[in-house]
Every structure is written in C-alpha cells, then in structure tokens.
C-alpha cells in the first residue's frame, strides 16, 4: 500500500465516536477552518448546498441544549467545537434561495435558467421529492450527512476527534434554537449535531467491522 493510501486508512482507524473530549485542548483556528471548508466544499444534489453550519461555542446555549440532547451529554461539556448542521426546507426551483444560487453564486446566464428550472422540476416530481414538505426536507437532510462525513474524515486526517449525534429531542431543541434566534424554522430544520476536539482517553476497544466479503459485492 502506498503512503497516501495508508494515510487515509490510518485516519479511518483513528476515527471513533468520541464520547468525551479533553476540555483543556482546543482546535486551532487553521485546523477548524479546514474542517469547515471541507463541509462547505462537499457535493450536493444539483449543487444546491441545502445546509447551514452553526458553530456553538456559547456555554449557556450548550447547557440549554444539553438538557434535551441525551446523546451529547459529555460532548457538549467538553468539545472544543460543537456544530449543528441544519437542512434547508422547501428547496424547489422557484424559491428565492435557488434563484439566488443560480444568479448570485453560480452566475447562470439568464437564457439558461428556464431549462434548469424545468430539469429541476422534472427531477423532483419524477422521484417524488416534491410530494410534500417532509419529502423535500428528507431529501435535503440526507445530503447534510455527506458534508458531515467529509468534515469528520478531514478532522481525522488532522488528528482531531469527532462524534456525530442524532440523540436529541427534535421538538425541544428546535424550540430552544428558535427562541434564541439561531434557527429560522421557516427555512431550516436541525439535521444532525457533531462535536470536535481531542479525546480524553483512548478507546477501550479496537475498531471492529464486518469482513469485506460480507458487505462488498462485485458485478463484472
């Protein structure tokens, strides 16, 4: 195995769901900005980036979240950086958000926008993505996990630990974030949380996975 391949595999062996971080160790700005950048540069369906990353460093807000986040008890207390990943709601071709992306970010020529809108409409209708608000949100939420995985992998390559978290009371956490002015519930929902930092102790057990023959099939 060449050096680059080994470096990648080593990072995946290094990564584990860190339940408790060392609160005395902080991630440098350079390293954390790199982690965020890998999230920002992650792929998304039709390049629509249906996410928003909120870095929660405020201790009071972390404490409020802790009351309704059973899966993040130690992580909220000890993580160097704690991120909420929001998924955008109601991403359809004619929304202000998509129109902003097409014109303001991607710089589409005006003459090409109707064709994109038609393609987008057909895609969402054919695959029942636009059936209702829930199917639209689920489509966006799934994509946030691509960014999540990339951020965790880049962290591992930097020797930084992480822990993805779904164990939280969605309604209560939504209420807290809405009351705090952090979450606009008309535009976003909470998809997943993730803590970053440096492990307080080494894992008690090594990484265990199924044999590759049990989970990989080749069709030649």
Curated annotation (Swiss-Prot):
InterPro entries xrefs: NfsB-like (IPR033878), Nitroreductase (IPR029479), Nitroreductase-like (IPR000415), Nitroreductase/BluB (IPR050627)
Necessary cofactors: FMN
Biological process per Gene Ontology, one example term: 2,4,6-trinitrotoluene catabolic process
Superkingdom: Bacteria
Keywords assigned by UniProt, alphabetized: Flavoprotein, FMN, NAD, NADP, Oxidoreductase
GO annotation, cellular component aspect: cytosol
Pfam family name, one: Nitroreductase
Listed GO MF terms: oxidoreductase activity, acting on other nitrogenous compounds as donors, with NAD or NADP as acceptor
EC number: 1.-.-.-
PANTHER family reported in the protein's UniProt record: NADPH NITROREDUCTASE, OXYGEN-INSENSITIVE NAD(P)H NITROREDUCTASE
Family: Belongs to the nitroreductase family.
Protein name as catalogued: Putative NAD(P)H nitroreductase SE_2073
Species annotation: Staphylococcus epidermidis (strain ATCC 12228 / FDA PCI 1200)
Lineage: Bacteria, Bacillati, Bacillota, Bacilli, Bacillales
